[in-house]
Amino acid sequence: MADGSRLPESATSTTMETNTNEHAKVLSPDAETVPSSSMTATSSELSLDGRWGERDQGEPVSRRGAMEDFEEMRRELTQLSLRRTRSVGKDAHRLRSRASGRASQVHDEEKAIDEEDSTIDGDGDGYQGGFDLGEFLMGGHLERRTTTGEPAKKVGVLFKHLTVKGVETGASFVRTLPDAVVGTFGPDLYRIVCSFIPQLRFGKQPPVRELLHDFTGLVREGEMMLVLGRPGAGCSTFLKTIANDRGAFAGVEGEVRYGGLSAEEQLKHFRGEVNYNPEDDQHFPSLTVWQTLKFSLINKTKKHDKNSIPIIIDALLKMFGITHTKNTLVGNEYVRGVSGGERKRVSIAETLATKSSVVCWDNSTRGLDASTALDYAKSLRIMTDVSKRTTFVTLYQAGESIYELMDKVLVIDSGRMLYQGPANKAREYFVNLGFHCPEKSTTADFLTSICDPNARQFQPGREASTPKTPEELEAVFRNSETYKTICDEVASYEKKLQDTDQEDTRRFQKTVAQSKSRTVSKKSSYTVSFARQVLACVQREFWLLWGDKTSLYTKYFIIISNALIVSSLFYGESLDTSGAFSRGGALFFSILFLGWLQLTELMPAVTGRGIVARHKEYAFYRPSAVSIARVVMDFPAIFCMVVPFTIIMYFMTGLDVTASKFFIYFLFVYTTTFSITSLYRMFAALSPTIDDAVRFSGIALNILVIFVGYVIPKQGLIDGSIWFGWLFYVNPIAYSYEAVLTNEFSDRIMDCAPSQLVPQGPGVDPRYQGCALPGSELGRRGVSGSRYLEESFQFTRSHLWRNFGVVIAFTVLYLIVTVLAAEFLSFVGGGGGALVFKRSKRAKKLATQTTQGNDEEKVQDVGDKAALSRGEAMSASNGESFKRISSSDRIFTWSNVEYTVPYGNGTRKLLNGVNGYAKPGVMIALMGASGAGKTTLLNTLAQRQKMGVVTGDFLVDGRPLGADFQRGTGFCEQMDLHDNTSTIREALEFSALLRQDRNVSKQEKLDYVDQIIDLLELNDIQDAIIGSLNVEQKKRVTIGVELAAKPSLLLFLDEPTSGLDSQAAFSIVRFLKKLSLAGQAILCTIHQPSSMLIQQFDMILALNPGGNTFYFGPVGHDGGDVIKYFADRGVVCPPSKNVAEFILETAAKATTTKDGKKIDWNEEWRNSEQNQRVLDEIQQIREERSKIPVTETGSPYEFAASTMTQTLLLTKRIFRQYWRDPSYYYGKLFVSVIIGIFNGFTFWMLGNSIANMQDRMFSIFLIIMIPPVVLNSIVPKFYINRALWEAREYPSRIYGWFAFCTANIVCEIPMAIVSSLIYWLLWYYPVGFPTDSSTAGYVFLMSMLFFLFMSSWGQWICAFAPSFTVISNVLPFFFVMCNLFNGIVRPYRDYPVFWKYWMYYVNPVTWWLRGVISSIFPTVQIDCSPSETTHFNPPPGQTCANYAGNFITNIAKNGYLLNPDASADCQYCPYSNGAEYMATLNVHDGDKWRCFGIFLAFVIINWLLVYFFIYTVRVRGWSFGMGYLFGGMGLVIDKVKGVFKRKSEKA
């Protein structure tokens, strides 16, 4: 693009036309074609015709193609409009008349796109006569134009004297476990309350500082402004301020106007018209592209125009070249879906569907390769031109082609405006100030370098006179002609608004008002009514449910399998009195299980907040609409869950087969599940994080279970639990339990079971027997179910429908709280933050010198001060340090490398015959298009592949790789994988101590770490926590960790510049170059190399998709060697073209020679002279190096450090991790305290009645409530540590599997002891258990073992399971089996044969319960209350003792008579002491130490399973046949689905 082709913005009417026509030149394929003497497709053309995502699918982003698609959509909408017009002809006629009148009066100065539209269509009359969209266009549809063709919504953005202030947070210290514990008692609560009610803050207010200083400027409609600056300069702050997203700032001064609208008016009435799009693509992964766009349009299209939605979606898909992804899941990093580039386009299309007028895009090219980034920018240009939007963009690495698409540029440094004006004049402006622009530097890189003291260059002789500081550069700019022009533009724009009486603004307001549904207030920011918002969200909830079929099918599998297992436990339940209590247990499980399973609803409720918040800003819907929609969706979803569960449970457990009773049972299971789900969602809405939501929900459910009336009868709760008895009345499950229990037992007369008849034996007259069941009547062998419930639980059937109403009322209450919380609470952070340090003298000293503003980027002054030196000069001492990094002269070669993986029913080759070598002092750039196999080759060379087949020769000095190869190489992951709670120094020391040779002393290793910290210039922030670092600092730490290992052979780096701004990327590559010059061999993948970056590399290894090499050789001066290779084959690189982009685009496109022959670049390389030279070089290296005698340069061990050293250092690190991440340990303490208090004080000082014995049993049993909550914290922590070990630390041979297992196990022990002690103290003594040391000590030991069992249980499950999904599915199964098959809920004697002789005994909880019960119960003497005794009359003339003595002594052998001398109404107590009571539980006196030993064995087995599964599954790769199992299940499911699909097609 010629510099003179773009004029500075002015108030003239020709400016926009000039700019738009210029963009047509840039974007049009016709303008892009450059003739070539040898090729039919030139590199210039290639550079502007890239694709997003997969190279073999997507479509090129073409502005002309997009405009044609847009016109096709308009024609289709015309037909739609015409059909509608026939029915409302008169209205349309009036509308056309008004439009015609306006057209004669109003002159639109921005017709460029309309002119091009008519050129494309070629039929001017087509729009005059046929395109009668009248009402449709005035309703605010996509193009937002009037009937005359002018934009209906034109909103320029004007900002005057804009100053933004943020709170100075300062460098903070890491929060540790003691801080969390102390915070519980007030400080944390105070901070939370003050965050919602700032007026409650007292004391000195935190200081504020300016984030942006006095910005003035204008961006007209249809213009794009590029905002440039280093991370932390204030770019995101500026964009958020323009987007009116000001919640994170302390204050905003000055004026921002949108046309004639103030910021306040825009926020209140037009929020969705100004949008901010963050750099991350946040979408629901299980929605398809079509569904994502349809949902957006549903909420932005009034009902009258709903038929236009499919037409607009098709146009958007065509416009952005993603039609082929229409029915593909959007996906994310965990769910497979569209590619990253395609997901970017979905974000753009969604934003276009919002029909907003101003859009701010924040660094949205992060992670994209150069070609994809260009296509992204072209798409923004399309969006801006087609819909006349006002667009702001920040980009960290912008190529020249991207820069040329922009109208204006704004350069920011430290919140100061260094330049604002025409993009094509920015370079000239700074050159005139005295700065030097390197020949190969892009304009964007040059402008960004102005903000970096170490990167900018001055013209010779002007170093002193050129302004340098942000303040000086700002002052110079304010005195420049460019700034005066801006001020004139602003004044002219304001004058135009006044002269036209703000006609555009009024038209904008009218258009927005007419775009709303009739039932929506014209002052509302939303387009459709709240009811339609809810309906749209309901539709999306259904899509989400159906889109994630794996989770859906898994949930049904869990429901059905658990229903079968549990109902089989109660199968064949006797209908007489012996089955009464067990029947109550089955009913209790029925109303509880599905609610418990619904804990999975917490995850989508919390993780979807970011999307909901963004959609609120887009004015799609109110957040409360989502909450209500989820409830609406629960009706059918829960119904489908309850149907199979209730049918299985009801009929297999032998409940009363009466239609009315079954449907009442079904109703209460359904409503209870609904209520519990609503309760979970309420906690999710009130919780900042998913950990908090799980913790609170789990504890709440446990408390509800205690106070349901099953564990302790209703009267016992109310009278006996003096602190918490009231919880029964606020417990919806209690009302449901009363309902289902009375429903089952009412109108039922139970025959007394022979075993419960008192007395029994020879000579006993049946007329003089009683039944040992509460509710039995004197002289009757049958027991009324209603009377039984009244006596045992104080339940009555007359409360049935009252209880139903109460459950509904609680559900509504939870829903109301959820809706209010969703509407008024927001836990979505604004990003950014200060450095966090560990507490040390060095860090404290630094913290007093450092302050930090609350900018949106991670603005870290300390980090900037400690930045890598980007100047050319280097001290002699640093030079010596670099020379000491690598002293190895070994050469690594690879030849004919191929890598094949299973794919479908066959295989796929990802690498194909790759050859190469890495010499000391040589830096190789590994390049290729997306999917070419760069990372695959890097992992293969580093010997990190875990699946598939690798073939080829990998040699070091001509010899096979040794056991220490991986230890001798460094591998820098792209994702910067670290323990985020470690400091920089700790991470480097950990790497050095474990990876350097074991013969090197510890002091030498630590001294070496000091050198690395000096080289990386991390001294000032060496005590900073890694998790608080910015992107560049983390990259430096990643490199430092690998250098600290002192790799003796090779350093691999995977995308070390990804996500960095251009200057940070250059500094990283410059640093690598210095390492290379010092003798280090480096192989590095890179995907957005500028010309300056690529010059730092010595060689390029370039791959095409399929892992085919198409170039391996030197770069040459200014890329001369690469250019010559392609020029010799007829492809000439333009002088200004980036060499890296040139070779990638050339190889990716099918090119032909003059004679029409297509060039296969892969084959061209294989047959080239250069390839033969590479093969000869590899052979020569092998022959020469293999003759050199082998010298022992280090230990031959696989791991440098001993297993003991590995274990000790890793244990120390994990302890430190738990200490600095207090939520983990704190969560365990919190659960122990809460459950301990509720357990202990609910069963306060139990007496000696039978009911109290049952209370003792359940008090002991309630420890099983802790595992579901605790395991949900253990599993994620272990999983994260395991992922880090598998991804980086084991492949680098830092430490082995034994050390990993041992350290994780050991670190759980202290907290298990502490939390078990807390639980034991809060539970044991308040209940009134024996206080003698032997019993109390034994129970404490068992409690401690149980907590150790929990941690090891979660660890071995996590060690085996491949993913969180599998873990979440496995855990409920284990919980059900352990909680039910232990002899408490259903007595052992009543077990079905199938379970009786194995499940009971392999259940660890069985032995824990038996051990504790056998320790506590024997010493208790039972005193029955009269209501607990069995009543019977002796025959006339006999006393109770005479009549029942033989029964008590010889048959029952238990119990005693309360009135042995009475001759009527004998009262028999079935137990005289605890030993007799526990015998009914299959527990015997003297079992305790046997049970202790067996339970200890289970704990040890758990630990051994951790070692076993980590070694077999993670190290050896065993699957235990699970792959075949799941593969077979998948085939079966596919066949079944195929059958149904064929049937539906036939139908």
UniProtKB/Swiss-Prot annotation:
It comes from the Eukaryota. It catalyses: voriconazole(in) + ATP + H2O = voriconazole(out) + ADP + phosphate + H(+); fluconazole(in) + ATP + H2O = fluconazole(out) + ADP + phosphate + H(+). It is a multi-pass membrane protein. The chain crosses the membrane at residues 552-572, 586-606, 635-655, 657-677, 698-718, 722-742, 804-824, 1230-1250, 1260-1280, 1309-1329, 1334-1354, 1356-1376, 1397-1417, 1491-1511, 1520-1540. Residues 111-123 have a biased composition (Acidic residues). Residues 36-47 have a biased composition (Low complexity). Residues 10-19 have a biased composition (Polar residues). ATP binds at residues 928-935. Residues 1-66, 85-123 are annotated as: Disordered. Residues 197-439, 892-1130 form the ABC transporter domain. Residues 51-66 have a biased composition (Basic and acidic residues). Keywords: ATP-binding, Cell membrane, Glycoprotein, Hydrolase, Membrane, Nucleotide-binding, Repeat, Transmembrane, Transmembrane helix, Transport. SUPFAM superfamilies: P-loop containing nucleoside triphosphate hydrolases (SSF52540). GO terms for cellular component: plasma membrane. Pleiotropic ABC efflux transporter involved in the basal level of azole susceptibility. Confers resistance to fluconazole and voriconazole. Belongs to the ABC transporter superfamily. ABCG family. PDR (TC 3.A.1.205) subfamily. This is ABC multidrug transporter atrF. The gene is atrF.
